[in-house]
Swiss-Prot record:
This is Pimeloyl-[acyl-carrier protein] methyl ester esterase. It is an enzyme of class 3 (hydrolase). PANTHER family: AB HYDROLASE SUPERFAMILY PROTEIN YCLE, MONOACYLGLYCEROL LIPASE. One of its GO terms (molecular function) is pimelyl-[acyl-carrier protein] methyl ester esterase activity. It holds the Pfam family Abhydrolase_1. The gene is bioH. Substrate binds at residues 28, 86-87, 149-153, 240.
Length: 263
């Protein structure tokens, strides 16, 4: 296992395991410690657990999504599979579009190409007032805002109370996110719309959804492009954090799909 962070290398990336390179990217308000429960099952891969800029142990990086992706690309191996949860899925999707030769497979978990609801297009997503509420609360009470967001992620799951506790315990093992990075992330969730660019993704693409997800409604999946290289898995009882609430079902979707990248 090794981890790196320095003045020249502001991203904290923890590398564990041996095998094909797999990059794993967390969502808003948390850090890569949320994936700790998956370490053992992913040990046949060389997994790079990334703290996004300003989250966990990574230093903030000013700029937009492209700036973040450039920093990731410069510090991660080429020819890797990229997996992203929630906001991390948006990051991984944009990276697969912008750097197709670097990314040989894409996995999005409870993620949308456009998180914001667009009423005029009947596009399902997060109501605008919810994100603006989080933005306002950030300035008042950072820890409470993070905790409230974790609660929303588990909402709908039968084990919501336990899920929230597990997420909170994992996330709080590292420093709270940088306030500016949280605002950057909210802006990305608010503004980015990749729907018209999805047809350029030619890599094998696994999309894992939670039917009870309160942030990425189940109605998003039928509106997504389909093709022979795309696999959709809808977990019937999962909410926004399926790898926490339904780890075995999540791994049953993920691990067989990953075997195509083994030599």
């Amino acid at each position: 296992m090794n981890a790196t962070t320095s003045a020249h290398h502001p991203l904290h990336i923890e590398t564990i395991g041996q095998g094909p390179d797999l990059v794993v990217i967390h969502g808003w308000g948390v850090n890569s410690a949320v994936f700790t429960p998956l370490h053992e099952q992913l040990s046949e891969y060389r997994v790079h657990y990334v703290d996004l800029p300003g989250f966990g142990l990574s230093q903030p990086i000013a700029g937009n999504l492209s700036t973040w992706i450039d920093a990731l690309i410069n510090n991660l191996p080429t020819n890797a599979i990229w997996a992203g949860w929630s906001l991390g899925g948006l990051v991984a999707t944009q990276a697969a579009i912008d750097y197709p030769s670097h990314i040989k497979g894409l996995i999005t978990i409870a993620s949308s190409p456009c998180f914001m609801a667009r009423e005029e297009e009947a596009w399902p997503g997060i109501p605008p007032q919810v994100l603006s509420m989080f933005g306002e609360q950030l300035g008042q009470n950072l820890p409470k805002t993070i905790e409230r967001f974790l609660a929303i992620q588990a909402m709908g799951s039968e084990t919501a109370k336990e899920d929230i506790k597990q997420l909170r315990d994992l996330v709080l093992a590292r420093p709270l996110p940088d306030a500016a990075a949280l605002t950057q992330g909210l802006d990305m969730l608010n503004q980015i719309d990749l729907r018209m660019q999805l047809s350029s993704i030619s890599q094998p693409w696994l999309r894992i959804w939670g039917r009870l997800d309160g942030l990425v409604p189940k109605r998003v999946q039928p509106q997504m492009p389909t093709a022979s290289h795309i696999t959709d898995v809808m977990l019937a009882k999962a909410s926004h954090a399926p790898f926490v609430s339904h780890r075995q079902e999540f791994l049953q979707a993920l691990l067989p799909w990953l075997t195509q990248f083994k030599d």
